């Protein structure tokens, strides 16, 4: 019998750096408030670009050592976020970065895009069985922006939830990362005519694959107090996010609002009490019995064992 914090949050991301960019503030917020935060990363990000010139030979087309290097970057990012429980799905290196949609790398025999859905989902089910999180975060069906590994992460997470539900320990709520249309429109207006406009060529916010109507947003997590932690986590991924990245350009203009506020749609579960015209939640655990307090909860049946197919810092 192992005791864990009463509030337990599980995130499933495709590559190292996705956790920091998309959910870093949320992770840091819940870790700082005593929740048990677990990150499962599905690949090592072997096909990523290398933005550090002296490390260029690590690229997939050269020495193909980038994945191993990114393990260290991810560990540093987790430290910045205060997250101590990280695992790679199936173990580090089990699934390879598939590269962008339509590339030959999609067909690599270890590409995550080629993974057997039930096998990969079963590996995630073991993590769910061990930790029994109440909340799961992953991407929508388009993987937020269409990357095959993001789409596959969505499929694996949702299949794992289905399998866990059949055994009675599925997370009560499943959220998908999202960006409200109003926030994107405000950004486009702000950067219009700017030399560093990250929305160059976009006429309407709805053209962006991750644009979500405000009324479909379920939760707005204001973790502006953690914006420094999120930026530190992003900077830990130096091979992927150069100092002149448009991400930092937006942050420089919007500051803690950009770095510290993250949005989600609710895919599974009942929405809790919210605020504003659309009733946005300000807590992912809203409406759940563990929404208040930080008591520790016993977790049995496997909590003392290392999860099948999962490795990482604990």
Curated annotation (Swiss-Prot):
<dbReference type="GO" id="GO:0010125">
    <property type="term" value="P:mycothiol biosynthetic process"/>
</dbReference>
<keyword id="KW-0862">Zinc</keyword>
<keyword id="KW-0378">Hydrolase</keyword>
<dbReference type="GO" id="GO:0008270">
    <property type="term" value="F:zinc ion binding"/>
</dbReference>
<feature type="binding site">
    <location>
        <position position="15"/>
    </location>
    <ligand>
        <name>Zn(2+)</name>
    </ligand>
</feature>
<feature type="binding site">
    <location>
        <position position="150"/>
    </location>
    <ligand>
        <name>Zn(2+)</name>
    </ligand>
</feature>
<dbReference type="GO" id="GO:0035595">
    <property type="term" value="F:N-acetylglucosaminylinositol deacetylase activity"/>
</dbReference>
<comment type="similarity">
    <text>Belongs to the MshB deacetylase family.</text>
</comment>
<dbReference type="InterPro" id="IPR003737">
    <property type="entry name" value="GlcNAc_PI_deacetylase-related"/>
</dbReference>
<feature type="region of interest" description="Disordered">
    <location>
        <begin position="291"/>
        <end position="314"/>
    </location>
</feature>
<dbReference type="InterPro" id="IPR024078">
    <property type="entry name" value="LmbE-like_dom_sf"/>
</dbReference>
<dbReference type="Pfam" id="PF02585">
    <property type="entry name" value="PIG-L"/>
</dbReference>
<protein>
    <recommendedName>
        <fullName>1D-myo-inositol 2-acetamido-2-deoxy-alpha-D-glucopyranoside deacetylase</fullName>
        <ecNumber>3.5.1.103</ecNumber>
    </recommendedName>
</protein>
<keyword id="KW-0479">Metal-binding</keyword>
<feature type="binding site">
    <location>
        <position position="18"/>
    </location>
    <ligand>
        <name>Zn(2+)</name>
    </ligand>
</feature>
<comment type="function">
    <text>Catalyzes the deacetylation of 1D-myo-inositol 2-acetamido-2-deoxy-alpha-D-glucopyranoside (GlcNAc-Ins) in the mycothiol biosynthesis pathway.</text>
</comment>
<dbReference type="InterPro" id="IPR017810">
    <property type="entry name" value="Mycothiol_biosynthesis_MshB"/>
</dbReference>
């Amino acid at each position: 019998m192992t005791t864990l914090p009463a509030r337990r949050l599980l995130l499933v991301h495709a590559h190292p750096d996705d956790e920091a960019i998309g959910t870093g503030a949320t992770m840091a917020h819940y870790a700082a408030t005593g929740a048990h935060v677990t990150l499962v990363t599905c690949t090592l990000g072997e096909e990523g670009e290398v933005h550090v010139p002296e490390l260029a030979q690590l690229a997939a087309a050269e020495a193909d050592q980038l994945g191993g290097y990114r393990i260290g970057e991810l560990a540093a990012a987790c430290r910045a976020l205060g997250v101590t429980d990280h695992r790679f799905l199936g173990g580090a290196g089990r699934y390879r970065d598939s590269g962008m949609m339509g590339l030959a790398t999609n067909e690599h025999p270890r590409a995550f895009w080629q993974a057997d859905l039930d096998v990969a989902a079963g590996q995630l089910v073991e993590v769910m069985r061990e930790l029994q999180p109440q909340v799961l975060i992953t991407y929508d069906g388009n993987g937020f922006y269409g990357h095959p590994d993001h789409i596959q992460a969505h499929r694996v997470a949702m299949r794992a939830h289905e399998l866990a539900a059949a055994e009675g320990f599925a997370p009560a709520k499943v959220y998908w990362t999202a960006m409200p249309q109003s926030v994107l429109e405000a950004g486009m207006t702000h950067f219009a005519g700017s030399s560093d406009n990250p929305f160059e060529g976009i006429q309407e916010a709805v053209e962006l694959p991750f644009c979500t109507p405000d009324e479909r947003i379920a939760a707005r997590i204001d973790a502006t107090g953690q914006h420094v932690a999120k930026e530190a986590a992003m900077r830990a991924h130096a091979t992927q996010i150069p100092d002149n990245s448009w991400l930092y350009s937006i942050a420089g203009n919007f500051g803690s609002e950009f770095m510290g506020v993250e949005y989600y749609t609710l895919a599974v579960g009942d929405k809790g009490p919210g605020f504003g015209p659309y009733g946005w939640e300000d807590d992912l655990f809203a409406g759940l019995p563990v929404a208040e307090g930080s008591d520790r909860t016993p977790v049995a049946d496997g909590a003392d064992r290392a999860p099948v197919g999962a490795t990482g810092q604990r």
